[in-house]
C-alpha cells in the first residue's frame, strides 16, 4: 500500500492534472491523506481537485490538527468534516497538536479534543467523526484518545454511557455460551 500525505489539493489544487492522475493510477493500491485545517479551505478549486482524485479511484482521507482558536469548536469541525464528506474525503485523523517549538499558542488540552469528539459523536454521521490521536513522541505511533464510554461491570452486566451521557446496561458474554454455539 502506498500512502501519500499532502496538502496539495488545498494549497495548489491546479497541480491535480490529468497527467498526474494517470501517473497515480499506475501505482495501486494508493491512498491519499489530505491535510485540512478549516472549512474555509473547501474552495471550489479544492473541491474540484478532490473530486478528480476520487473519480480516479484514489481513496481519500483527511488529517486535521486540532488548533486553538482556529478549529477548536464543535461547529467548526462539524462544518469541515461534513464538507469533506461531500467531496468524498473521509475524516480520518484529528491530531492533538504536537509539542514542537513555537506551537504552544496553538495547542489545546487533551480534554478539549475529547470534548470535540463527544460533540460530534451522536450528533452527526459516524463517517464524520475522525479518530482523535496523539502521534506519540519517540516513535510510539498513533495512540487513540477516546471518551470513556465503558463505565464498568456489575452482576453480569456491562455498564455503558452514550454520547448524551445516559447509562445503559448490556449483558456480559459468558464463555460457556459463546463457544461452539450461536
Model-derived features: positions:
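Conserved AdoMet/S-adenosylmethionine-binding subsite of the radical SAM
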Residues: 1-124
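Auxiliary Fe-S-binding modules of radical SAM enzymes
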Residues: 85-182
Amino acid at each position: 500500500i502506498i500512502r501519500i500525505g499532502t496538502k496539495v489539493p488545498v494549497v495548489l489544487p491546479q497541480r491535480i492534472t490529468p497527467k498526474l492522475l494517470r501517473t497515480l493510477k499506475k501505482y495501486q493500491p494508493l491512498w491519499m491523506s489530505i491535510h485540512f485545517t478549516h472549512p474555509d479551505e473547501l474552495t471550489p478549486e479544492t473541491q474540484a481537485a478532490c473530486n478528480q482524485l476520487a473519480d480516479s479511484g484514489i481513496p481519500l482521507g483527511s488529517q486535521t490538527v486540532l488548533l486553538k482558536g482556529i478549529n477548536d469548536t464543535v461547529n467548526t469541525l462539524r462544518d469541515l468534516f461534513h464538507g469533506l464528506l461531500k467531496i468524498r474525503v473521509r475524516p480520518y485523523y484529528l491530531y492533538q497538536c504536537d509539542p514542537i517549538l513555537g506551537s504552544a499558542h496553538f495547542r489545546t488540552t487533551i480534554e478539549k479534543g475529547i470534548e470535540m469528539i463527544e460533540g460530534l459523536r451522536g450528533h452527526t454521521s459516524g463517517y464524520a467523526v475522525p479518530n482523535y490521536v496523539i502521534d506519540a513522541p519517540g516513535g510510539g505511533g498513533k495512540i487513540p484518545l477516546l471518551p470513556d464510554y465503558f463505565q464498568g461491570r456489575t452482576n453480569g452486566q456491562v455498564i455503558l454511557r452514550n454520547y448524551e451521557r445516559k447509562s445503559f446496561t448490556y449483558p456480559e458474554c459468558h464463555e460457556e455460551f459463546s463457544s461452539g454455539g450461536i
